[in-house]
């Protein structure tokens, strides 16, 4: 490599050929303590001052100071010699004309506006100099004139002043673009300014000695600014720097007021609250972006750019937002008696929707002061905001400093007539209580975005470790959730549980019947679990069975009772403790394990009443006393398949399980808890006590009301964990509810408090829910879990209408917290039996014989309900609105569009508008769509939608282009191309292929990236089957349907799992993909390449989702890979035909709206037409038509008029292999009948029409 030597003040540097001039300048500037904007000129430049840095025959000139001095009125010598100045400046401008010309102009304008009043006249020399530099004309001719430059300076200054006022009002809040590098020079200190804005030009790195934890990076925009404008502020105090002398870090901070500094550990922390950068000059088409300011060791703050896909707009007001008080565009409302504020801003990164919100709603912010939840009361909204229709805009709840504020996020795009269209995210904040909260939430949302960007790899690692993706690959479960998504009132759940009651109809006659046939007592089984059997004669008592005589009263004869129970063979009497029947039946017969004194005549008085013993096990669903256990609900045992998994000799000896004989036949029991509002807390405490050792009997644990109140108060620090379940309550209401010890502690809504407070997994089991009960859990060969449900949904379940349930909230958020606790408890929520009267639902705990094993099975079941991706919640459909129209998209149409959009992706949808359900019926769902020449949707059901532009066609909706009035034709050729029936088939192919492309791109990710680890573990089909898709994907790439850059961006944005439920599904996908591509001709593929919607469709909506699992592709291939339109379909009735009249004269007849325009054809013309038909070549026949118009074809209403119609040109084409002929009829230029078609039917129906092969003129 060639080198040269450069001597700078006695130091020799080696210069390589690869060094750019900029690098050489930096080397010299570093040695001579100059900046990189200093330009080195030969010594012949006489205007350079003597104290300028020199190196050999060159001297360094600071162009900024040099040009400012030339036009500065404070210069005693006046401007420099024009010839010298132009020669020197022009030689420097020639090095980089585009950037250096702007720099020179900025220097002159800055000098002029800094040292002169705006009303001063621009002197002639300044005009000549500006002309010479800007026009590159050294002759000095005044081209523009003083007035031109005076307006330039005045507008520049006016815009700066307006910008200052807007910043002071905190209006026009948008992120902006920044790029900064190099260092500051140690120069003089800055000066203070009061809300004034001027530029620091140059590219610098910000140095601050003490890093701020989270600098605010919300940036303000300006319509026209200088090259690089930077403003630093500390709590509203603005600093103005002299651009010639940028300050050091110490001097910059010392100039700021210290009264607003905060102290942490007796150290004052310096905060830089705002900074602003604008790159560009005099261009209304601005570029915005998010800039990230982060602390760096030894440097202070470094500024970097997060992304650069910001929109460019041609009208600044279309992107400018309003934020603050007063002025235009500010929304101030009076909600609930107080003034609230609403504002919006944009983030030019759509990752905010797909990744950021998903992450922060899943994390639930357990240890943070601010949390994000989903507002389930605003799941669908339709509004015309910011001149755009936003059909799907769920709201989120943000908790900030004990305030609950709602915000929404929508994906929007700029106006359709802008050259560069890019989507961005708009955040709208609703009903903030004050401006501090308004600005604080905006700051925090942006800061969270930055946090996510900076910790993206750590977050991905966290999900990989905690979400147990290996266990979720093949799960297909029904989501079981509480059907009532409303705040419960006391006794409401108990009332619901008692709605369905199956009463036992006892038999009234016969032998060997139940004792309840002769004793009419309600809820007999509640007191006696083992009921005796009745016979009329003592001879009917089975041998070996003891019996007693019983008098049923009411004049009935005595009967004999015996017990048909092996574990309770002895009949006896017990005092009747059931309310309402004790007078008629003071004693009730029952079966016991031991003999009792149960003679009927021995029970005449209370002193001889049988002894009442303490019962330790109950077979009914009554509320248990503290000294007893109860039978576990039958459905819970069936669901867990306890006969299969629990009847094992390998029980868990380290966990308590009751050893009483009465419990021997049960593999799961429920434990007793005191009745009260804090029963859920006590149930967890007793269950956790059981898990400590095999001797830790929970019945021995003494828990008082004061202890429960203390535990409840301790949970207040975890209240944010339950924020999603309590989305409909403000932070103050949540705290008040938790502080009130008399209010019901609802485990359905506060389960996460129990989990984090007691460090245990809590699984809820509710009796009385109306969802389909679970029958069992089955394990696959790969040890995954599948749930089975009872087929008979309507059958009666007695008191055991039980389901495994999760707290109610929107399906987009997850139930299971990120932390997997070592211990697990199961809570049983019920309301006792029919006669139980409770103020609140009762909560008990469930113990299993093999507790650890069973709860682990339940945990895997709950993991099947783990978080669905936020993109399943968010499928944005956005429509840009034309400014000139006043038409609004009606609600039915909007909901119908969204319904069709979802149904086309295999999703189930229930649309809501103002709390009124809109069914997906034929009344609201469009039946057809009309698309224009570039594949955009312009009409529905034959009605043009003026208010929407650039809308994606709906793949599942038929295309109908018969409605010609919707189209605006620029020329006749455009009309013929649009009305070509092939066009509909091509557009259909486009949308089928685009959806197919998305799936194939996902499914081949493992093949393309098989050497990496990004997607390799996220598929259930092996490499061999993926290799079968190579040819299909390669054909897509080669055809240009999608490029590899878009494909990689798709992977980066999506990072989604696309799975197949079976090998058959994967094979069917490969087959349909290959079949669809084989059906497409090369011409059709080339047409699809022209569609600009292909890459736009590669977005965030997950295809092939189902109710059971959003991660599985389940037999939904047929929903989008349909058979293409038959090529024999003709969208238009032939308006032109050949026919014979009554005189056997041939007519050429043209029909328009049932009016027939015809002309008789003479023999010569008929012969000429027949010859053309018999020919194998393409021929053209033209003739004038002098016609008679027949009204409705009725001779009685003949109304003749003569006119000269356009010359018709018949293009006749004969199929070389068939006997049929296709004709195309066109006309001369600009005829109203242009572009119509007709055909002559073939003799054989199978040989009719092939429009695909028709060659158009």
From Swiss-Prot:
Q: Which residues form the signal peptide?
A: none
Q: Where in the cell is it found?
A: Virion
Q: What Gene Ontology terms describe where this protein resides (cellular component)?
A: virion component
Superkingdom of the organism of origin: Viruses
- Alphabetic keyword roster: Virion
Keyword Protein biosynthesis listed: no
Q: Does the keyword Phosphoprotein apply?
A: no
What family does the entry list?
A: Belongs to the ascovirus HvAV ORF146 family.
The identity of this protein, by name, is: Putative structural protein ORF146
What species was this sequence derived from? Answer: Heliothis virescens ascovirus 3e (HvAV-3e)
């Amino acid at each position: 490599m060639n080198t040269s030597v450069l001597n700078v003040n006695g130091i020799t540097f080696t210069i390589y050929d690869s060094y750019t001039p900029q690098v050489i300048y930096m080397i010299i500037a570093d040695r001579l303590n100059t900046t990189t904007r200093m330009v080195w000129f030969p010594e012949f430049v006489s205007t350079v001052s003597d104290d300028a840095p020199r190196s050999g025959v060159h001297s360094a000139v600071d162009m900024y100071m040099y040009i400012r001095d030339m036009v500065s009125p404070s210069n005693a010598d006046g401007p420099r010699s024009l010839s010298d100045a132009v020669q020197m400046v022009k030689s420097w401008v020639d090095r980089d004309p585009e950037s250096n010309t702007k720099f020179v102009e900025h220097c002159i304008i800055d000098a002029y506006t800094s040292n002169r009043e705006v009303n001063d006249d621009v002197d002639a020399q300044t005009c000549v100099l500006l002309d010479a530099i800007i026009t590159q004309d050294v002759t000095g001719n005044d081209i523009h004139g003083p007035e031109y430059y005076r307006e330039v300076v005045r507008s520049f200054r006016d815009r700066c002043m307006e910008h200052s006022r807007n910043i002071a009002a905190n209006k026009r809040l948008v992120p902006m673009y920044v790029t900064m590098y190099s260092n500051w020079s140690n120069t003089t200190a800055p000066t203070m300014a009061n809300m004034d804005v001027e530029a620091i030009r140059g590219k610098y790195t910000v140095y601050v000695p003490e890093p701020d934890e989270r600098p605010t990076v919300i940036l303000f925009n300006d319509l026209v600014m200088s090259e690089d404008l930077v403003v630093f502020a500390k709590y509203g105090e603005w600093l103005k720097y002299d651009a010639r002398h940028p300050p050091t870090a110490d001097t910059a901070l010392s100039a700021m007021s210290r009264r607003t500094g905060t102290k942490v550990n007796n150290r004052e922390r310096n905060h830089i609250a705002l900074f602003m950068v604008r790159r560009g000059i005099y261009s209304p088409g601005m570029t915005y972006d998010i800039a990230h300011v982060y602390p760096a060791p030894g440097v202070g703050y470094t500024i970097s750019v997060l992304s650069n896909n910001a929109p460019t707009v041609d009208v600044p007001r279309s992107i400018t937002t309003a934020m603050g008080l007063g002025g235009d565009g500010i929304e101030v409302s009076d909600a609930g008696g107080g003034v609230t504020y609403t504002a919006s801003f944009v983030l030019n990164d759509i990752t905010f929707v797909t990744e950021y919100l998903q992450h922060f709603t899943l994390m639930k912010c357990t240890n943070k002061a601010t949390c994000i939840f989903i507002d389930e009361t605003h799941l669908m909204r339709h509004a015309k905001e910011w001149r755009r229709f936003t059909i799907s805009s769920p709201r989120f709840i943000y908790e900030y400093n004990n305030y609950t504020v709602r915000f929404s996020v929508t994906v929007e795009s700029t106006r359709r007539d802008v050259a560069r269209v890019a989507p961005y995210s708009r955040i709208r904040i609703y009903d903030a209580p004050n401006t501090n909260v308004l600005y604080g939430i905006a700051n925090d949302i942006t800061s969270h975005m930055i946090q996510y960007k900076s910790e993206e790899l750590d977050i991905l690692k966290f999900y990989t470790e905690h979400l147990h993706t290996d266990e979720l690959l093949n799960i297909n479960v029904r989501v079981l959730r509480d059907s009532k998504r409303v705040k419960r009132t006391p006794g409401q759940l108990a009332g619901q549980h008692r709605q369905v009651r199956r009463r036992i109809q006892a038999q009234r006659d016969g032998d060997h019947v139940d004792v309840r046939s002769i004793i009419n007592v309600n809820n007999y089984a509640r007191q006696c679990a083992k009921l005796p059997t009745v016979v009329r004669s003592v001879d009917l008592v089975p041998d070996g069975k003891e019996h007693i005589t019983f008098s049923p009263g009411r004049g009935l004869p005595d009967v004999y009772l015996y017990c048909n129970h092996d574990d309770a063979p002895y009949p006896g009497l017990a005092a009747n403790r059931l309310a309402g029947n004790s007078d008629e039946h003071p004693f009730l017969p029952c079966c016991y394990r031991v003999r009792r004194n149960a003679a009927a005549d021995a029970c005449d008085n209370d002193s001889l009443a049988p002894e009442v013993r303490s019962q330790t096990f109950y077979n009914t669903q009554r509320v248990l006393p503290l000294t007893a256990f109860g039978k576990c609900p039958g459905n819970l045992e069936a669901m867990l398949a306890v006969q299969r998994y629990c009847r094992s000799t390998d029980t868990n000896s380290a966990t308590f399980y009751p050893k009483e004989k009465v419990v021997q036949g049960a593999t799961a029991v429920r434990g007793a808890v005191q009745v009260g509002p804090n029963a859920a807390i006590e149930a967890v405490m007793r269950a956790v006590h059981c898990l400590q050792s095999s001797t830790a009997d929970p019945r021995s644990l003494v828990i008082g009301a004061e202890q429960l109140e203390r535990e409840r108060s301790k949970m207040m620090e975890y209240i944010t964990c339950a924020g999603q379940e309590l989305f409909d309550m403000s932070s103050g209401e949540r705290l008040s509810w938790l502080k009130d010890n008399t209010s019901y502690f609802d485990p359905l809504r506060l389960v996460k408090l129990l989990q984090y407070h007691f460090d245990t997994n809590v699984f809820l089991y509710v009796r009385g829910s109306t969802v389909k009960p679970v029958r069992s859990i089955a394990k696959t060969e790969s040890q995954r879990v599948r749930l089975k449900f009872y087929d008979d949904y309507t059958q009666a379940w007695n008191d055991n209408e039980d389901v495994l349930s999760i707290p109610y909230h929107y399906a987009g958020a997850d139930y299971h917290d990120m932390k997997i606790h070592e211990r697990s408890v199961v809570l049983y929520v019920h309301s006792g039996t029919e006669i139980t009267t409770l103020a609140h639902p009762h909560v008990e705990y469930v113990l299993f014989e093999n507790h650890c094993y069973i709860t682990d099975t339940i945990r895997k079941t709950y993991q099947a309900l783990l978080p669905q991706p936020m993109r399943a919640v968010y499928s944005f459909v956005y429509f840009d609105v034309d400014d000139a129209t006043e038409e609004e998209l009606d609600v039915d149409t909007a909901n119908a569009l969204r319904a069709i959009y979802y149904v086309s992706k295999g999703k189930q949808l229930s649309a809501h508008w103002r709390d009124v359900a809109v069914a997906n019926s034929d009344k609201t769902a469009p039946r057809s769509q009309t698309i224009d020449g570039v594949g955009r949707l312009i009409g529905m059901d034959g009605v043009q939608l003026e208010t929407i532009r650039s809308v994606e066609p709906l793949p599942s909706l038929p295309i109908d282009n018969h409605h010609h009035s919707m189209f605006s034709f620029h020329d006749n050729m455009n009309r013929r191309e649009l009305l070509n029936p092939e066009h509909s088939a091509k557009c259909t192919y486009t949308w089928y292929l685009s959806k197919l492309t998305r799936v194939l791109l996902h499914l081949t990710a493992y093949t393309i990236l098989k050497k990496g680890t990004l997607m390799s573990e996220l598929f259930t089909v092996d490499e061999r089957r993926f290799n079968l898709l190579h040819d299909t994907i390669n054909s897509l790439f080669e055809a240009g349907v999608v490029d590899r850059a878009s494909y990689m961006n798709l992977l980066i944005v999506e990072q989604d799992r696309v799975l197949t439920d079976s090998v058959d599904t994967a094979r069917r996908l490969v087959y349909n993909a290959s079949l669809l591509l084989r059906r497409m001709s090369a011409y059709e593929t080339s047409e699809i390449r022209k569609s600009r919607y292909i890459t736009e469709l590669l977005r965030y909506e997950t295809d092939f989702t189902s109710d059971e699992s959003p991660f599985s592709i389940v037999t939904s291939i047929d929903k989008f890979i349909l058979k293409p339109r038959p090529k024999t379909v003709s969208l238009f009735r032939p308006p032109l035909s050949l026919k014979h009249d009554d005189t056997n004269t041939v007519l050429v007849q043209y029909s328009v709206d049932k009016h027939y325009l015809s002309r008789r054809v003479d023999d010569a013309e008929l012969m000429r037409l027949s010859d053309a038909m018999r020919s194998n070549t393409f021929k053209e026949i033209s003739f004038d038509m002098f016609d008679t118009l027949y009204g409705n074809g009725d001779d009685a209403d003949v109304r003749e008029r003569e006119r000269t119609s356009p010359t018709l040109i018949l293009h006749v084409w004969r199929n070389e292999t068939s006997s049929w002929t296709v004709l195309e009829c066109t006309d001369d230029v600009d005829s109203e009948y242009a572009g119509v078609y007709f055909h002559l039917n073939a003799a054989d129906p199978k040989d009719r029409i092939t429009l695909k092969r028709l060659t158009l003129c």
